[in-house]
Each structure stands twice: as structure tokens, then as C-alpha cells.
Amino acid sequence: MTIGYTAKYTKTSSGYLGQLVEWPEVVTEGTTIEECRALLRDALTEMILAYRQQGREIPPGGDLLEQVLVEV
């Protein structure tokens, strides 16, 4: 089974903060966006394993974010 999650990346002074919208406990930091993506995927994999071991329900994915542009 494949589940899609929505990642949100925020630029910080030391790189990037990555967090899943549907599962906010899955969060990480990386010095580059590529590193942050890889670390977020690793964190998600570890969280899924932990939830399964604890018999907890894995949050559903599927949210969609869209950037809305406006001229100011």
C-alpha cells in the first residue's frame, strides 16, 4: 500500500525545516532542501515502524497544498 503525505519546507537560518502536514510529529531539519527531503523520508519510515510496533493507527495522507499568488 502506498500513502502520499504532504511535506512543508520552511527556510531557516541554518537550512530547511521539513514537516508533514497530515502528521506534524514527523519533522526534521537539513542544511539543504535535498538533505531535508531525505531526512524527512527517513523520519517518516521510522515513525511508521514505531506506530506499527505500538499498534497505533497510521494517519491517512492525501492532503494537498497549493500556493496562492496575489499582487500587492
Q: Can you annotate each of these PLM segments?
A:
Residues P24-I33:
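A short, exposed loop/beta-hairpin motif centered on an aromatic-Gly-Thr core
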Residues K8-V21:
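Short aromatic-glycine-(Arg/Gly/Cys) micro-motifs in beta-strand/loop hairpins
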Residues M1-Y5, T12, A38-V72:
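Short, charged, surface-exposed hinge/linker loops at domain edges
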Residues L17, T32, E57:
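Gly/Ser/Thr-rich beta-alpha loop segments that engage phosphate groups in nucleotides
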